[in-house]
Swiss-Prot record:
It comes from Haemophilus influenzae (strain PittGG). It catalyses: 2-(N(omega)-L-arginino)succinate = fumarate + L-arginine. This is Argininosuccinate lyase. Belongs to the lyase 1 family. Argininosuccinate lyase subfamily. It holds the Pfam family Lyase_1. Pathway: Amino-acid biosynthesis; L-arginine biosynthesis; L-arginine from L-ornithine and carbamoyl phosphate: step 3/3. PANTHER family: ARGININOSUCCINATE LYASE. InterPro entries: Arg_succ_lyase_C, Argininosuccinate_lyase, Fumarase/histidase_N, Fumarate_lyase_CS, Fumarate_lyase_fam, Fumarate_lyase_N, L-Aspartase-like. It is an enzyme of class 4 (lyase). NCBIfam families: argH, PRK12308.1. The keyword Amino-acid biosynthesis applies. Signal peptide: none annotated. It comes from the Bacteria.
Amino acid sequence: MALWGGRFTQAADKRFKDFNDSLRFDYRLAEQDIQGSIGWSKALVKVNVLTVEEQHQLEQALNELLVEVRSNPQAILQDDAEDIHSWVESKLIDKVGNLGKKLHTGRSRNDQVAVDIKLWCKQRVIELQESVRNLQRHLVQTAENTQQAVMPGYTHLQRAQPITFAHWCMAYVEMFDRDYSRLTDAYNRMNTCPLGSGALAGTAYAVDRDSLAHDLGFAFATRNSLDSVSDRDHIVELLSIASLSMAHLSRFAEDMIIFNSGEANFVELSDRVTSGSSLMPQKKNPDACELIRGKTGRVIGSLTSMLITLKGLPLAYNKDMQEDKEGIFDALDTWQNCVDMATFVLDELKVNVERTREAALKGYSNATELADYLVSKGVPFRDSHHIVGETVVYAIEKGKGLEDLTIPEFRQFSEVVGDDVYEILSLQSCLDKRCAKGGVSPLRVAEAIAEAKTRFA
């Protein structure tokens, strides 16, 4: 059933109908369309379009339809309705007859779809926050279990300074915490109800839009009808958050792939998140992490597509805006799947503590400690930096670590070096000295873990 047609003397060509119809993807808004319709029916009672009895009859029928949708949402796809709004109205008329035709009074599909997608996005934000928080909890638990796992920290993918695997985990806790808070901010901004804005100029019925907004779970009604039906900021914002969070997930996945490589051998991924080769029997591939990394471009592509769609649109609604749904549906589904998969990767992750420690002892990652040691002996830092650089070159030529050099060897470069140098060159000393807030010292990492556990409890 089309919601329009009186203006036309010819039926739409099937090719155009197939091109124009959106039910194949906007069926996902069925529950929200029904919820919005129930709210609108109550608003129509207050302006004497519906009687109380008629509203009760409509609400009962809509609730019955809601149960049917929840039991088998895919059944909607068997229909040839133009969109989800047409489908809901058609099914309502099947249940209550001509009374169902009164429900659209004062309402446009423009404000109808605007409220539907906002209701859907609000619900997805809640679900996404639950998934992100669950990932954070798993990272914190992994951190708690790996506080003694010393490993190299990297800059430019070169060994830089010793850290712990726990400190690495907690870095991602912070990244995902920002993603979580961005979702909260986005939720607050989208928590305004556009229903009652009509096609663009507002509704001709004196609907109490603030009451309607509260009935539908919004904080308040939107302030401008033209903006209300044109606004897709919340979709762009969620796509932006999803893209940034996917970038965080991709970095997590890339680290895991590197750590899992035969050259590093820092971690072993579970058989349950890896796959093999059809040719090479020995292979155990980190496919879960590679797919997270690969899907990141897909989500970012949805953001780019949406921005390009909106950038040239005049006010108010244009059919281009129908293109908002497939991108946001796919991007948020992909994001949530990747968050959940990253959580699964952590479930049975094994950290090779001996191997990480062995790697941390290589690469002269204690060179900064030697520079700080010279500073403590009165050498200006810029001079100590140069001295240590020369010392490292010497150690490389001799095939030694800094901690393996003798005092006479050290004193070729600085006379201030004494026997106390060896203590500060140990891995434990390297960690312990980084004791400012946010540092890698075991004490600070333990505090960060405890604080996060309390926050996420």
